[in-house]
Amino acid sequence: HTISRRQRQMCIRDRSGIAKLYRQSGLFTWQLRGGSRDSLRPGLQDPWKGNATRGSDIMAYRSSPASSDEAHASFAWLRDLRAEGSVEARSRARDLITDWIGANSSWKLPDWRPDLMGERLAIIAMNYGWYGDSADETFQSRLAHSVEMQLRCLAMDWRRMRSVDQQIGALRGIALAEAALGGEDSRIEALQDMLFPKIRNVTHDDGGHVSRMPDRHIRLMRQLVEFRMATSLASVDGSALSDTIKRMGAVARMWRHGDGRIAHFNGGGGISAEIAEETLLRAGVHGKTIQQAPYSGFLRMGSGRTVVIMDAGDMAHGDDIIAGSGTLGFEMSVGPTQLVVNSGQMMKDPTLRRVMCSTAAHSTLGLDNQNSSSPRDGRLASISGVEVGEAPGGLLAVGAHDGFERSHGIIHHRKLYL
C-alpha cells in the first residue's frame, strides 16, 4: 500500500530521534574513544588573521565566546586571541579549550554538528603551534583524545551533509586533524582523492563556483587553501590542488573593485577587502587580471583607475543558491569609489531578500516590473553573443539575453564601452 507524505515525514523524524538518543548514549561515546595519539604536531600555521580588538575584548571579559553557541563551537575566537598575542591570551585560549572539552566529552548539539566540527578541527590544528606546543602534557593529551573522537564522528557524518560545499569543509577539517595527529601520508592522499570529485561538482572549468556567488566562491577557496596545508605537512603532492586554487583565484580577482572589495552579484558584498586580499595572497594569483570567465559568466574591463564588472552568465538556481535576476547587470568603480553597484542580497529577511534579487534592484534593463528570469515559472534568461576586448580608443563588452522574449517579444542587447 502507499505511504502518505505525512507518514513518511513521521518515519524520518522517528529514525532521527532514535539516532539522536543513540548518539547521546555511553555506547556511542565508547565507539568514538580508543585513540592512541597523545599530542598534536605543531607544523601547521593558520593563514588567516584574527581580530586583535575582539581578542582584547575576550581578555577583558567585555565579550565571551560562549555568548553565541555557534561562534563558540567553531573556535573562531581562537584566531582573535592569537591576534591579541600576549602570554595571557595563550593561557586564556587553553582555559577555554579545556572548558569546552569538559562540557563536550560526549556527543551533543550544536557543538557536534558536522559543519562546526570541520571548522573547529581545522582551527585547532592550524593554531596548535601557538597555544598547544608549549602546554603541559595533560592538556596536550586531553586535547589529542578529544580531536580523535571528533575526527571519528566527522568521518561518519560528512557524507550525509546536504551541500557539496559543506562536505568539502568537513574533508578539510578531517585532513588537517589527521595531519596534526601525525596520520599516515596515505590517509591525506586518500582524502585528497575524495576531494577532487567534490571540487569538480561545484566549480566550472574556468574556476568559478557553479553558484556564481562571489562570497561562496571565496569561502570555498579558503577551505582549499587550508586543505593544501595538510598535504604539505604530510608531504603529499598538492600541485593539482594548487592549480585549482589559482584558477579560482583568477576569477575572484576579476570581481574586485578599486577599493579591494568584491562585487555584489548573487548575494555578494559580505566579504571584506582585507579577507579578499589575504585569500588572493595565499592563492598565489599573479600576472594580469583576466577579462572573462566564460563558463562562470563574468566580464571585466579596466582602464586607468576605472573598473567595470559585468554579469554575462546564465542564472544559477538551486535550493542553497542566492541568485539575483540581474542578467547583463554591471558594477563600476573609479579608484576606491564605487559609482554603480548592485544592492547585494545579504539580508536574512526572505521578503526583503526576494526584493533585492529582482531585476529592478540591479543595474540592468527591466520591463513592466518583471524579472528577466523566474525559476518558479520555469523561465530562465539565456545568454548569447558575449564578448569583451579592445575597441577603437578603449574596451567593449557586449552580450544579449532573451529573458523578455516570451513576455514582450524583446531581446535585450547590451554594449558597455570604456
Where does each model-flagged region fall?
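Aromatic-lined, polymer-binding surfaces characteristic
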Residues: 65-245
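Non-catalytic C-terminal accessory modules of carbohydrate-active enzymes
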Residues: 288-418
